[in-house]
Amino acid sequence: MTDQADAAMPIKFTDAAAAKVKGLLEEEQNPALKLRVYVTGGGCSGFQYGFTFDEKVNEGDFTVEKQGVQLVVDPMSLQYLVGGEVDYTSGLEGSRFFVKNPNATTTCGCGASFSV
């Protein structure tokens, strides 16, 4: 995908996140799995991010494909994530998927919850 096409996407899926998903799918030996990111009520800031692996894409889901793997977002969650980026980090504090969300007005210290 070109940078221009990437910029037109409502949510970005970084190379680091796609590479990690690809590695996890190889470990699981299930190429049908997709990384699903979603938003639910809760957390210390009002909303929280969730990540899970899912084999299916539901009607209305938005998908982004990179490096042969897919990121899936349901329509309700997408409205809170437009302009955001799903990334992956690994460091001294551990490894995790996370969302860089320009719509978040506040976030908690761990970055797992936010408010708009």
Swiss-Prot record:
Iron-sulfur cluster binds at residues 44, 108, 110. GO terms for biological process: iron-sulfur cluster assembly. Keywords: Iron, Iron-sulfur, Metal-binding. GO terms for cellular component: cytosol. Its cofactor is iron-sulfur cluster. Binds 1 iron-sulfur cluster per subunit. GO terms for molecular function: 2 iron, 2 sulfur cluster binding; 4 iron, 4 sulfur cluster binding; iron ion binding. Required for insertion of 4Fe-4S clusters for at least IspG. Belongs to the HesB/IscA family. NCBIfam families: iron-sulfur cluster assembly accessory protein, PRK13623.1. Homodimer. This is Iron-sulfur cluster insertion protein ErpA. It comes from Shewanella sp. (strain ANA-3). The gene is erpA.
